[in-house]
Structures are given as structure tokens and as C-alpha cells.
From Swiss-Prot:
Organism annotation: Pseudosoriculus fumidus (Taiwanese brown-toothed shrew)
Cellular localisation: Mitochondrion inner membrane
Subunit structure: The cytochrome bc1 complex contains 11 subunits: 3 respiratory subunits (MT-CYB, CYC1 and UQCRFS1), 2 core proteins (UQCRC1 and UQCRC2) and 6 low-molecular weight proteins (UQCRH/QCR6, UQCRB/QCR7, UQCRQ/QCR8, UQCR10/QCR9, UQCR11/QCR10 and a cleavage product of UQCRFS1). This cytochrome bc1 complex then forms a dimer.
Listed PROSITE patterns: CYTB_CTER, CYTB_NTER
Entry's Gene Ontology BP terms: mitochondrial electron transport, ubiquinol to cytochrome c
GO terms under cellular component: mitochondrial inner membrane; respiratory chain complex III
Protein name per the record: Cytochrome b
């Protein structure tokens, strides 16, 4: 008799995705981040659901409702900090997942990669709107500054900003709609992640060597299920350590002050995971130019497959490209640091140089180095 998991209409989808899926035998721990992102999304949806039961999206009571969750709701503090720090873990996994894709040439799966880029935008939008909800000082001013950037769009800019605000400033209408979008977007992200997986399973996974692994496949279960479970346990260990010992480590103290439109904080800055893009935005004195650079800093990922000039897929056997890749990583860390600094002498020029280097590495240096490596190998 054929196994039920291979015949039942629902079970066979799960079977072909997580049990009998042929996987390369040599994929490393860098391939764990897909499943970790799935776990992060589940944690965020569940904690968010319980927070939404107690939160009120009204400018007068939003801040108080978050305080009420932390003080009066059973384990409310735990749910709130799991959600806030869960977002940080989500972005750590996202950056490592994208970095893995860049290093090992996973971007050659075009559909999977492009849906991944859209997912990155969707997660960033969701995180931004979530940061506005507690209605602290940094929530309010962050929302004001970032939405105001759209006014740089010619002709329709100012109308667009007022349309998003639902008035002439960030107010009750803005908070209510941000809450609505923040609630619905994770479910859209979950659906997109399903499509992301669908396209991945059309081609099969890449592997560290970048070579075709059809001749050497192993079943996903038990080999990679157990490996993924180890990754999940480590993720939960790091997240719970962060939540229980230092829940405010990655937050901003200004957000413990209720929003006040009459008092601007000395340094307006987003959460740490947006600082690299914020630094690129600030490094260009022109408003429209800054906004374009901000969008392009993420959108550039979509054109990475077009810039692949190497005859090898992975960077595993390309030492010069590896050097440039790690310079890019160092550059992004530098940009993240600069994004959190005030706009004054040494930081302005460092930010501008780091921004130029970021685009130069991806658009010019890496493709040229790949061609050089091709010639060195006499291919």
C-alpha cells in the first residue's frame, strides 16, 4: 500500500516540500536561514496577534496601551519584548540569508531571487510601520521624517504624503492605517514566502560549490530537518537571552517618552536594521537624490544577476571576489554605525565615502574582478 503522505492531497504537498525533497548533500549551515526566517515570521505573527488583543490604535491611548501590556497583562512584557527583539532577529537572519545568496550565487535562480527582493521590501515596510505603533517620540518623528521623504517625488509628492498621512500631519488617521497595514502585511509576506519556496523547489537548492548537484542528492528528512531544528534551538536561545537579560539593548530610550509633536528629539534615527540605508540617504545633500539612493541601495539586489560576469557561480573558488565581498560586509557595518551618529564633521565624509564604495563595489569592482578571474583561469 502506498504511504498516505504520498497520496493525500494536502500531505503530499508537505511531503514534497519537507520530507522527500531531494537536497544537495553538501549544503552548509548558511542554508539554515530560510527555515529560521520562517520560524521568525511565525513568532512575529503569534506575538503580534496577542499584542493586537490589548493594543489600541488611537493617538490618545496607544502609548498607554503598550504600558498596560507591559505592566498588567499576564506575561505581556514577555510578548512585547519577544515581538520587538524578534524583529531584530528577523533582520539578522534576513541579512545573513541575502549575504549567503550573494556569496554562493543563489541569485541565478531569478524568480526565487526577485521574489526574495520583494519580500525584503515588504518586511522593511512592515517593520517601519510596527515601529510607529507604540507612539513614542521616535515612533512619531520617525514616521514624520520617513513619510516626508515621499514629498521629494516631483508633481505628486506633497499630495502623496498628505494622502498617506490622512491629513496635514502624522496623526490619528496615520496611526490607525499603519496598525491595519502592520497587521495584514505579515500574512501577505507568508503567502509570498510560499511562492518563494515554490520557485525554489522548481530548480532545487544551490550548494556551496555552485556546481550541479543532481548526481548527489539526499532526502530532506531526516538530514536537514534535524539540522534545521538545531538552528531553530540556537535562534530561540539567542532571542530568549536578549529578551530576558537585555530587552532594550537594540531599542531607543526616546521611545519611552510619549509622542510630542512640539518637541523634536536631538537625533532622529530608525531601528538599527535600517541604519545602513539611512546613512546612504543622509550622505546625499539633495532630497530627491537621497531618496533615490535609499531605494536603490536595496533595489540594486534585483540587478545583481545581470552583473554576474564570472564563469563560476559561487565565490567558493574565487579569492579576489571573496575579498571584495568581505569589504562590502565591512562597508555595510560602517554604514550602520554612521547611520546612528549625529550629522557632523568626521561622520559626514565617512558616510559619503562608505556610500560611494557600496555602489562602486556592486556595480563596478565585483563584475570587473570576475572577468579578471576568468582570464586568470584561462577560461
Amino acid at each position: 500500500m502506498t504511504n498516505l503522505r504520498k497520496t493525500h492531497p494536502l500531505m503530499k504537498i508537505i511531503n514534497s516540500s519537507f520530507i522527500d525533497l531531494p537536497a544537495p548533500s553538501n549544503i552548509s549551515s548558511w542554508w539554515n536561514f530560510g527555515s529560521l526566517l520562517g520560524i521568525c515570521l511565525i513568532i512575529q505573527i503569534l506575538t503580534g496577534l496577542f499584542l493586537a488583543m490589548h493594543y489600541t490604535s488611537d493617538t490618545l491611548t496607544a502609548f498607554s496601551s503598550v504600558t498596560h501590556i507591559c505592566r498588567d497583562v499576564n506575561y505581556g512584557w514577555l510578548i512585547r519584548y519577544m515581538h520587538a527583539n524578534g524583529a531584530s532577529m528577523f533582520f539578522i537572519c534576513l541579512f545573513l540569508h541575502v549575504g549567503r545568496g550573494l556569496y554562493y550565487g543563489s541569485y541565478m535562480f531569478l524568480e526565487t531571487w526577485n521574489i526574495g527582493v520583494l519580500l525584503l521590501f515588504a518586511v522593511m515596510a512592515t517593520a517601519f510601520m510596527g515601529y510607529v505603533l507604540p507612539w513614542g517620540q521616535m515612533s512619531f518623528w520617525g514616521a514624520t521624517v520617513i513619510t516626508n521623504l515621499l514629498s521629494a517625488i516631483p508633481y505628486i509628492g506633497s499630495d502623496l504624503v498628505e494622502w498617506i498621512w490622512g491629513g496635514f500631519s502624522v496623526d490619528k488617521a496615520t496611526l490607525t492605517r499603519f496598525f491595519a497595514f502592520h497587521f495584514i502585511l505579515p500574512f501577505i509576506i507568508a503567502a509570498m514566502a510560499g511562492v518563494h519556496l515554490l520557485f525554489l523547489h522548481e530548480t532545487g537548492s544551490n550548494n556551496p560549490s555552485g556546481l550541479c548537484s543532481d548526481a548527489d542528492k539526499i532526502p530532506f528528512h531526516p538530514y536537514y530537518t534535524i539540522k534545521d531544528i538545531l538552528g531553530v534551538l540556537l535562534l530561540i536561545l539567542v532571542l530568549t537571552t536578549l529578551v530576558l537579560f537585555s530587552p532594550d539593548l537594540l531599542g531607543d530610550p526616546d521611545n519611552y517618552t510619549p509622542a510630542n509633536p512640539l518637541n523634536t528629539p536631538p537625533h532622529i534615527k530608525p531601528e538599527w536594521y535600517f541604519l545602513f540605508a539611512y546613512a546612504i540617504l543622509r550622505s546625499i545633500p539633495n532630497k530627491l537624490g537621497g531618496v533615490l539612493a535609499l531605494v536603490l541601495s536595496i533595489l540594486i539586489l534585483a540587478i545583481v544577476p545581470l552583473l554576474h560576469t564570472s564563469k563560476q557561480r559561487s565565490m567558493m573558488f574565487r579569492p579576489f571576489s571573496q575579498c571584495l565581498f568581505w569589504i562590502l560586509v565591512a562597508d555595510l557595518i560602517t554604514l550602520t554605525w554612521i547611520g546612528g551618529q549625529p550629522v557632523e564633521h568626521p561622520f559626514i565624509i565617512i558616510g559619503q565615502l562608505a556610500s560611494i564604495l557600496y555602489f562602486l563595489l556592486i556595480l563596478v569592482l565585483m563584475p570587473i574582478t570576475s572577468i579578471l578571474e576568468n582570464n586568470l583561469l584561462k577560461w
